[in-house]
Amino acid sequence: MESADILPGSRGTVDRRCEGSEEKITPPRPVEDFNPQLFPNEVYLNFTSMHGIQPVVARIRELSRKTVSAAMVPPLEWFERLPRLETPLDIEPLHLPFSVYLISGNAGSGKSTCIQTLNETMDCVITGATRVAAQNVYTKLSSAFATRHINTIFQEFGFRGNHVQAQLGKYQYSCSSSPPPIEELQKRDIVYYWEVLVDITRRLFESTASRGEFENIRALERLLGRAPGSLTRLAFCTNGSLPAFTRTNIVIIDEAGLLGRHLLTVVVYCWWMLNAAYKSPQYAEGKVPVIVCVGSPTQTDSLESRFEHKNLKCHVRSSENVLTHIITNRTIREYVSLSTNWAIFINNKRCQEYEFGELMKVLEYGLPITEEHMRLVDTFVVPEAYINNPANLPGWTRLYSSHKEVSAYMAKLHAHLKVSGERQFVVFTLPAYTFVKTAAFDEYKKITQQPSLSLDKWLAANASRVSNYSQSRDQDAGKTQCEYYSEHGVVVARTDVTYVLNSQVSVTTRMRKFVFGFSGTFETFDAVLKDDAFIKTQGETSVEYAYRFLSTLLFSGMINFYNFLKRPGLDEGRVREAYRRMAALTAKLIPGASVLESACDNPSGAPLNFRGLTDPPGFTGGTTNDWDDDNDVVFAALNEGAIDMLYCNYEFVRPETTQEVYSQFLMLKTMFVGRYSIFMDLFGGDFESSPFDTFVDNISYKGCEIFVGSMRGGVSSIALQTDSYTLMGYTSAPVYPFVEELARRKLHEGIAELFGAMNMPRMVLRDQHGFMSVLNVNLSEFVESVDDVELDMATAVDYGLSSKLAMTIARSQGLSLDKVAICFPRNNLRINSVYVAMSRTVSSRFLRMNLNPLRERHERDTVISEHILAALRDRDVQIVY
């Protein structure tokens, strides 16, 4: 490796990037002398991509040190006055200082790797624009190191569930000059987002909770005679509920192109307000927030929806996104010095085929489309009927432009499976429920002046709003049936939803699951044990629980080795040798099993005296009543080596202390690895690909339903939207952690009673590693906002699953898909949507589409493309290849 002191020079010098740095840059030294400024000792960097990323890290670190004078710091009193204003138009314009660093690039170019490096090199708040974006970042970060949960930017600045239905843009502010100064733009955004911001502000200052954590730390420093700021970090150790914005001034937002332009000011406003309210050290120092926006302005749209209650219609419109706003708005661009604070990542690393990569660049940057590009896309085109026929392209993911098209394809797929005689992919139906409170519904009709509004009509119009995810409209759902429970004041709407057994699915939100077994092969289970994958992904609450669970699976699954030896066609000599070696291994690890080893070495082949195993030392006689003759015959008929003496000599208990838990796991893991090595030596590949199933208790199947004796011994975990699952069926077995979680929910009394009596089944999933889990039901509460009145209208309960067999193009954003078939619309075709859909594939060999969008009439955002092309020619912009 080259000297750590040599920074990769890329359109700018090290001196310019680090100008104003508080740390001293030492002159070049020998290779073995480590430079702590460039490479801190506690950090492991990805050296293959560090060449271009290091200047990005240096520049963001430099921006984070920027401070403003005390006169420029927004005063606490300004925030406290806002909730008392009659209208947001009366807000006194105030400059809220901030910095921006923009990281853009085409799909799969390494933007997430850059976020990972920033996370490892500096203290920052990492967020996503959506839950999927946040969990994608979490997956990337946790693959290298243990990391805290990643929230959305909305969760970090205080957005709550009741804000979803807030009416944005109710007030409008027009700037008085052109181009407007920065404080005018900020007032415009605050006024636009007023309904949400005023509620967040009011809730903060009306809260009775103490906000004196940092004051207490400063008092402790004075008491101990310590230097000011020396104990500041203790505040986050002793007060876990402190807002993340008070910890650091670096805020990273992934997929920022999905956010409206006003969200930039909203984040800056909330950062200053929280730091002022908590009197944080960075507020006292006058530090300025650095908003690192990651994404692509040409890929994504910012969408805003507004529900019209009178006509029961939801209007969705595109709005200018944050990235486009930063790049194209003259005031913002000059204020943040965009040229020196912009990194563009080039080259698609997801699909590394040269011609296809060049095509993606053309679509991304608005370059001229040639006949050669069109001919390349022609090779992907097949008839639309071919894509929409479920019998074709099995296992491919269909992408559509609308939820209606997705739902229609799913219905067609299910109808095909019902008549195809397919045994692996079986169709089954389960009920989903919506509980509507009659009192709230009557109040809604009164406020909206719709006395004749029927519940069926309201449910049909609000189906996508009642659930907490838009993919609910993708499902193949039957007709809704309503039943009125007058004593409970609730109407229960039931809808039957169709699912496909053994199909690929994902969860629609962050949900609780209970892992109770493993279903895979000997090879996959051995891989899980060797790389500690389960400990890293499931042991988030307590490592002891994860080790205890694995010990249970190991103990229950050891019998699979003996079951393998009963397969017909195996060489008898190798089978006898396997029995002998396993007996020796068991005797070595469990001293009480030594009797087996001596029996296996008995050349006479005489039956093992099973009665003698239970006799005390020196016992020579006794009554025959102790042993049943039939049992004696059964045991004596078995070859002595065919019995796994692990189960005869080892009492499986649930240890309490950490040392005992790990000792038990280590012994059982050693036994599994030893047996695995024996069988690989004797049977090779035939063995490692054989089934290995193990559970905490006995299970049985009846059609698509799974029966489990007991869930005791399983472990609670979290299912993320970025995980890939196979739908294995459903179960009605009680899962006590789920029962306790439901009891903690503050549900309407009538709804809680009705739901508890339904015994709603739960889905059983297998993850990408092979672990089997029961998924809790997805329970979401719908609060309607009408004319400043909030109505707690309904509670929806479903299974929280979304099929990977078909989805909208918008939902596929950020995903890598193996095989993709796209149905583009023939009208309103947009190139950025085409780019998102085509760039999902990892290989163009597995890409099909119904038309060539380059030969069709389409819309293209040339304005933003021109700005990006200009940036590529700007020597101050950092280019990362």
Swiss-Prot record:
Superkingdom to which the source organism belongs: Viruses
Region (Disordered): 1-32
A Gene Ontology term for the protein's cellular component: host cell nucleus
Signal peptide boundaries: none
Binding site for ATP: 105-112
Localization annotation: Host nucleus
EC number: 3.6.4.-
Keywords of this entry: ATP-binding, DNA replication, Helicase, Host nucleus, Hydrolase, Nucleotide-binding
Stored Pfam families: Herpes_Helicase
InterPro entries: DNA_helicase_dom, HSV_HELI, P-loop_NTPase
GO biological process assignments: DNA replication
Ranges of biased composition (kind: Basic and acidic residues): 13-32
Record GO terms (molecular function): ATP binding; helicase activity; hydrolase activity
Assembly and oligomerization: Associates with the primase and the primase-associated factor to form the helicase-primase complex.
Family: Belongs to the herpesviridae helicase family.
UniProt cross-references to HAMAP family, sorted A to Z: HSV_HELI (MF_04030)
Protein purpose: Component of the helicase/primase complex. Unwinds the DNA at the replication forks and generates single-stranded DNA for both leading and lagging strand synthesis. The primase synthesizes short RNA primers on the lagging strand that the polymerase elongates using dNTPs. Possesses helicase-like motifs and therefore may act as the helicase subunit of the complex.
Name of this chain's protein: DNA replication helicase
